[in-house]
């Protein structure tokens, strides 16, 4: 099966400093893929390259090639805004648009794309909120401010907002690090359901979380991808001694 995402010799620089070195990684469609490693190892830097967020950082530069369904996402004819609709992003801390209602948050991306039909927007909002396991909790509060939701609900709202534009890949950068255990469990369960409709790449410092939710895991260290493979294999019989040292808690 041809991978949905292929990263080939990806290098990322901030000015003269190289933050990611020669990463090669394939991601299959309909899977959850965890990126693990100590702080500053390059995993989030690599994640942000997948939807061209480094375009917004002065002095940042990405070399190599990343293809999404065969298309080079850094190709000269690729519109970064269009690409970011194909590659959704959920950040570490919930970030609903504070001046918008729950409903307006979910459909904001569609409105930016010029979609105005109210019935269609409502249909997408309900589908996305159901997909984020939030509909039953907010269906009577769609016109209320999103900031009135709990932290866990706000994060699921951000997931619904990302799902509304039907991304091919959903990137999640430490999506549960600011949440309580119950909210974390809800989002972990949600990831298992979401891979039926999209592909997920999650950065996490929580190795137990990676083991619970992911199909494959990639271990980053000092800007390099040290090892990538099926999650169970990487945690129980890693090929590289550096991976073993990290997953057994000898460093990191």
Swiss-Prot record:
Residues 5-247 form the ABC transporter domain. GO terms for molecular function: ATP binding; ATP hydrolysis activity; ATPase-coupled phosphate ion transmembrane transporter activity. This is Phosphate import ATP-binding protein PstB. Its EC number is 7.3.2.1. One of its GO terms (cellular component) is plasma membrane. The gene is pstB. It is found in: Cell membrane. Belongs to the ABC transporter superfamily. Phosphate importer (TC 3.A.1.7) family. Keywords: ATP-binding, Cell membrane, Membrane, Nucleotide-binding, Phosphate transport, Translocase, Transport. Its main location: membrane.
């Amino acid at each position: 099966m041809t991978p949905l995402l292929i990263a080939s010799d990806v290098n990322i620089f901030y000015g003269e400093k190289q933050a990611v070195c020669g990463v090669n990684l394939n991601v299959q469609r309909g899977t959850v893929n965890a990126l693990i490693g100590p702080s500053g190892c390059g995993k989030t830097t690599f994640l942000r390259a997948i939807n061209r967020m480094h375009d917004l950082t002065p002095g940042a530069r990405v070399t190599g090639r990343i293809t999404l369904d065969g298309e080079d996402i850094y190709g000269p004819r690729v519109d970064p805004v269009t690409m970011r609709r194909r590659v959704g992003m959920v950040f570490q801390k919930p970030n609903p648009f504070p001046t918008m209602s729950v409903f307006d948050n979910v459909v904001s991306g569609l409105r930016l794309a010029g979609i105005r039909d109210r019935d269609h927007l409502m249909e997408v909002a309900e589908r996305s909120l159901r997909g984020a396991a939030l509909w039953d909790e907010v269906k009577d509060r769609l016109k209320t401010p999103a900031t009135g939701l709990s932290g866990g609900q706000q994060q699921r709202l951000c997931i619904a907002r990302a799902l509304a534009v039907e991304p091919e890949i959903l990137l999640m950068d430490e999506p549960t690090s600011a949440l309580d255990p119950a909210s974390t469990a809800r989002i972990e369960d949600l990831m298992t359901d979401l891979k039926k409709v999209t592909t997920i790449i999650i950065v996490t410092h929580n190795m137990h979380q990676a083991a619970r939710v992911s199909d494959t895991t990639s271990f980053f260290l000092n800007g390099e991808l040290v090892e990538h493979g099926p999650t169970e294999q990487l945690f129980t019989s890693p090929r590289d001694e550096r991976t073993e040292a990290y997953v057994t808690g000898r460093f990191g």
